[in-house]
């Protein structure tokens, strides 16, 4: 017969010294590494009415969890036993025992109470006290994991075995519903961050993958599939074009001509001096974009490590963020990042300084325009890292 070892004893009681008796009450959870300094010396459950027997001890259960191969200590649990019961039933009151906190009310007799311990199949009682629990001490009110008997476990196992054939379809329905709930939660999270709702095409591909054409597929069904593919591609194009409808500070330029870096943020100049021709053409899909992004401040850094200035401009408010990033010289991505600074000024770079979607300029077909007055150019010194319009 297998031996079951419960974990509600102190460290010296672990191992092969027998099963630990069950406490009559639910344990206390103490948020301290030294519970004997927190528990009052008269903290005895008053569920029993005989004041002469309100005496006993709290047995400390040390707990820990392993995280990444390292032991992490958790808050200990304390289980109460009346004097003369429990794992230290032979110990005298106030005898020095490791992991034991002796408690008693005034007038209690220092002799065995005879109350015994909890039976295996019974539930623990919620302990009641005549005083308020100290800060950091709470009663664990969830059912004890050791309470269910072996017969109850067998009956539950038989019940699960008998209901297994009937639960196949509901289980698949639950899995399907859980997948839908996950997709809805992801879509809501993306929408709150400024992204658009994922397309149905993405949902179907995530669930079923890319369907393969059947041998018996009719030409009509093939045409239908081609139309569906064209519609999905058209929806992707609309999705990319939709970048221009977002606020300037929410755009994600990509490799599409209608929503690249130049369309979203204008051509490269002294105020927009990051990106070579290849990076500007591909935006967030550029080859080195993930490495570049590692050197860009996070949202929290922009909020809490920046100098933020607000200025009204008509019906809008301009927020100016000024921040700095200190990067070690041996950072693996710093070299590539620096190569992208002021890359548009190099002769080998061919940046589209003009709007690629603008009409071709033809002076012969245009009417003579009125000459605008010449105004003196005003030099403005800027120290703007990021603007939110």
Curated annotation (Swiss-Prot):
Keywords: ADP-ribosylation, Host Golgi apparatus, Phosphoprotein, Ribonucleoprotein, RNA-binding, Transcription, Transcription regulation, Viral nucleoprotein, Virion
A molecular function GO annotation: identical protein binding
Location(s) in or outside the cell: Virion; Host endoplasmic reticulum-Golgi intermediate compartment; Host Golgi apparatus
Residue positions, PTM Phosphoserine: 145
Main subcellular location of this protein, as a coarse class: virion
Region (Dimerization): 243-347
Annotated segments matching region RNA-binding: 22-148
GO CC list: host cell endoplasmic reticulum-Golgi intermediate compartment; host cell Golgi apparatus; ribonucleoprotein complex; viral nucleocapsid
Biased segments, Low complexity type: 146-158
Domain CoV N CTD, residue spans: 236-352
InterPro entries with a match to the protein in the record: N_prot_C_CoV, N_prot_N_CoV, NCAP_aCoV, Nucleocap_CoV, Nucleocapsid_C, Nucleocapsid_N
Region (Disordered): 111-178, 194-264, 363-389
Amino acid composition bias (Acidic residues), ranges on this chain: 379-389
Ranges of compositional bias, category Basic and acidic residues: 159-178, 236-246
Amino acid composition bias (Polar residues), ranges on this chain: 207-235
CoV N NTD domain ranges (all copies): 20-141
Protein task: Packages the positive strand viral genome RNA into a helical ribonucleocapsid (RNP) and plays a fundamental role during virion assembly through its interactions with the viral genome and membrane protein M. Plays an important role in enhancing the efficiency of subgenomic viral RNA transcription as well as viral replication.
Subunit structure and binding partners: Homooligomer. Both monomeric and oligomeric forms interact with RNA. Interacts with protein M. Interacts with NSP3; this interaction serves to tether the genome to the newly translated replicase-transcriptase complex at a very early stage of infection.
Sequence similarity: Belongs to the alphacoronavirus nucleocapsid protein family.
Full protein name: Nucleoprotein
The species this protein was found in: Human coronavirus 229E (HCoV-229E)
Gene designation: N
């Amino acid at each position: 017969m297998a031996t079951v070892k419960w974990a509600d004893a102190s460290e010296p009681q672990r191992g092969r010294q027998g099963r630990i008796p069950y406490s009559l009450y639910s344990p206390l959870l103490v948020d301290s590494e030294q519970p004997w300094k927190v528990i009052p010396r008269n903290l005895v459950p008053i569920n029993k009415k005989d004041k002469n027997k309100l005496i006993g001890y709290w047995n400390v259960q040390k707990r820990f969890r392993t995280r990444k191969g390292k032991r992490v200590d958790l808050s200990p649990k304390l289980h109460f036993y009346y004097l003369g019961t429990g794992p230290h039933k032979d110990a005298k009151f106030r005898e020095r025992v490791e992991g034991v906190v002796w408690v008693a009310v005034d007038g209690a007799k220092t002799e065995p109470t005879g109350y015994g311990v909890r039976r295996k199949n019974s539930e623990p009682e919620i302990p009641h006290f005549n005083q308020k629990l100290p800060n950091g001490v709470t009663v664990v009110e969830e059912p004890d994991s050791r309470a269910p008997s072996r017969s109850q476990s067998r009956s539950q196992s038989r019940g699960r075995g008998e209901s297994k054939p009937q639960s196949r379809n509901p289980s698949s329905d639950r899995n399907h519903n859980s997948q839908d709930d996950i997709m809805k939660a992801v879509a809501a999270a993306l929408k709150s961050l400024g992204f658009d709702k994922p397309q149905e095409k993405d949902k179907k591909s995530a669930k079923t993958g890319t369907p393969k054409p059947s041998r018996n597929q009719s030409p009509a069904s093939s045409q239908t599939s081609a139309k569906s593919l064209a519609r999905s591609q058209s929806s992707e194009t609309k999705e990319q074009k939709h970048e221009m409808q977002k606020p300037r500070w929410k755009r994600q330029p990509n490799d599409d001509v209608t929503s690249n870096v130049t369309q979203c943020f204008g051509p490269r100049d002294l105020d927009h001096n990051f990106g070579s021709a290849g990076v500007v053409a591909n935006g967030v899909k550029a080859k080195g974009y993930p490495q570049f992004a590692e050197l860009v401040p996070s949202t929290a850094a922009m909020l809490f490590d920046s100098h933020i200035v607000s200025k009204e401009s008509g019906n809008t408010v301009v927020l100016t963020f000024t921040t700095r990033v200190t990067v070690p010289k041996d950072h693996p991505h710093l070299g590539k990042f620096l190569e992208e600074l002021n890359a548009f000024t190099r002769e080998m770079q061919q940046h589209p300084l003009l709007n690629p979607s603008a009409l071709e300029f033809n002076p012969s077909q245009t009417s003579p325009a009125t000459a605008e007055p010449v105004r003196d150019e005003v030099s403005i010194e800027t120290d703007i890292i990021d603007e939110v319009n």
